[in-house]
């Protein structure tokens, strides 16, 4: 049986992050080069998304993370500016990060775990516990990623999504962000695929 858990509550959001700052310590560079789980930046598992706190490497940062719920469009609150592109609603389009912390129980170890995104504007890069999983191009399609081999059951999981709406898919206001639901789906290792099973018809005619 497939269990679906809505993941829309309690996300962290960072708008227009710019380039990741270069770490000041040798230890940060060393650890980041050794394992995906200690990668530097907002996609990393141990990145501190609480403003004003010391990070894993003993450096103070003050990123303006916000607490938000999904669905979320982070561009719509702007005041339209005539200096921006009229075809895109006179809004400035810029990238952003989303992060969500969640836990799994021991009973989930034997199950297949999939994250299903109903819609993310533009280009989306998905990380779990610092590991890059998938890049999706297109804000008008759903997509999924299997996290069974990356998920942690003895510690907190951190899902990070980098959104870049500058893909110019439209000539109208397209918005920016995770603008539809996100689901965590748990199933048996062997289960019917999402869109069901079917038997192709190889010939037509009267059934016998």
Language-model region placement:
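Contiguous beta-strand segments within globular domains
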Residues: 203-208
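Predominantly extracellular/luminal regions of secreted and cell-surface proteins
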Residues: 52-75
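Hydrophobic alpha-helical membrane-insertion signals
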Residues: 1-60
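Accessory beta-strand-rich segments of carbohydrate-active enzymes
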Residues: 3-5, 12-19, 45-47, 73-77, ...
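Short glycine/threonine/proline-enriched tight-turn/helix- or strand-capping micro-motif at secondary-structure
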Residues: 81-85
